[in-house]
């Protein structure tokens, strides 16, 4: 009988502690940056407007994160259908220019251009080119850059 009573009291106390813990505000406010510098590559390979804008917004959010201010290198690697973001006939020029003005490297895959028969004149004049988008991602990852594919 004592054992049942002790188990019941113990279970009740554990339950009450869990309920009280849930009522207290969370103390976690995100990871604390411990490095002097961070590097990230964002990969874009879709022409979906929502995903393009979401990726550009994610880059902006990373640049605006107070923990990363002045400590972040960013590159946007575009390949495949993602080429839409750099096309002069699409509505992304101001967004992309804004990111470049904040130091974001804007890279376009030359393999995609060749396969899709896209001339550089069809793309913004201020972007850079890499021989292969996948190659760029591989190199950056091996150099320690974080890879983001929203």
Predicted regions and their residues:
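Bacterial N-terminal signal peptides
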Residues: 7-15
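Sec/Tat signal peptide C-region and signal peptidase I cleavage site
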Residues: 17-21
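N-terminal secretory signal peptides
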Residues: 23-73
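Structural recognition of the beta-strand scaffold that forms the well-ordered cores
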Residues: 40-43, 75-78, 105-108, 149
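Solvent-exposed coil/turn segments that connect beta secondary-structure elements
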Residues: 47, 79-82, 111
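Acidic helix-start/capping segments at beta-turn-to-alpha-helix junctions
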Residues: 73-86
């Amino acid at each position: 009988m004592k054992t049942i009573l002790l188990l019941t009291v113990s279970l009740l106390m554990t339950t009450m502690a869990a309920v009280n813990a849930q009522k207290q505000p969370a103390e976690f406010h995100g990871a604390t940056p411990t490095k002097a510098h961070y590097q990230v590559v964002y990969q874009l390979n879709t022409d979906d407007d929502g995903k393009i804008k979401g990726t550009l917004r994610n880059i902006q959010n990373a640049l605006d994160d107070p923990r990363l201010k002045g400590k972040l290198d960013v590159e946007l690697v575009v390949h495949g259908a993602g080429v839409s973001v750099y096309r002069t006939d699409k509505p992304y020029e101001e967004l992309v220019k804004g990111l470049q003005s904040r130091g974001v490297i804007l890279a376009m895959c030359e393999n995609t251009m060749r396969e899709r028969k896209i001339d550089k004149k069809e793309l913004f004049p201020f972007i850079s080119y890499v021989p292969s988008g996948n190659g760029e991602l591989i190199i950056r990852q091996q150099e320690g850059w974080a890879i983001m594919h929203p």
